[in-house]
């Protein structure tokens, strides 16, 4: 059984989720504004975070998913999640992330995305990483632009969220472009 690595940036530690993180995951993810920009359920059911955290090592061992807890280094406070859903056969991954509302607009998402791109290309030897975001969440699009990802298009009414079809914008980056 391999261990989910720990990544560090200037302000963040990206580490494996621990069972003790469950209450904070539930608190942060349970905010409707956070759920609206993600696929998190709302309301966030009791017990969901515990079950989800318990499944993470198995997914990592299957080489299909790696999720990191985003933690503020200075205060050891969990602020969100970032992960890669990996398709090993095609050497690509879908990146997803979310932050608790108090941590929006501080550059944390950009810092975490940059670290996970480096991990994906340098350690996992991926060829491509892409990230969709809901059109209604333009801040995520700005994060992806800042790290050098290329806008690849819009998928109209691609997902159903809170009873409505929503549009998704897609960004991607190739390994060779990341290392330029």
Region annotations inferred by a language model:
Residues 1-35, 67, 71-180:
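Acyl-donor (CoA/ACP) binding surface of acyl/acetyltransferases
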Residues 29, 38, 60-61:
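Hydrophobic residues in alpha-helical segments
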Residues 33-55, 66:
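Conserved GNAT-fold acetyl-CoA-binding loop/helix
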Residues 55, 59, 119:
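Solvent-exposed, charged/polar functional surfaces in cytosolic regulatory/catalytic domains
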Residues 58-63, 149:
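Short loop/turn motifs at secondary-structure junctions and domain boundaries
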């Amino acid at each position: 059984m391999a261990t989910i690595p720990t990544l560090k940036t200037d302000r963040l530690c990206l580490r494996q989720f621990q069972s003790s993180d469950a209450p904070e995951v539930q608190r942060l993810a349970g905010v409707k504004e956070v759920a609206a920009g993600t696929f998190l359920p709302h309301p966030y059911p009791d017990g969901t975070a515990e079950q989800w955290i318990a499944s993470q090592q198995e997914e990592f061992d299957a080489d299909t998913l790696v999720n990191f807890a985003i933690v503020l280094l200075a205060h050891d406070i969990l602020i969100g999640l970032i992960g890669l859903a990996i398709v090993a056969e095609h050497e690509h991954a879908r990146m997803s992330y979310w932050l608790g509302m108090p941590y929006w607009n501080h550059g944390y998402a950009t810092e975490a995305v940059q670290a996970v791109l480096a991990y994906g290309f340098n350690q996992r030897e991926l060829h491509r990483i892409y990230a969709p975001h809901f059109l209604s969440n333009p801040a995520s699009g700005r994060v992806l632009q800042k790290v050098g990802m290329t806008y690849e298009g819009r998928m109209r009414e691609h997902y159903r969220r809170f009873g409505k079809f929503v549009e998704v914008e897609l960004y991607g980056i190739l390994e060779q472009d990341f290392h330029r």
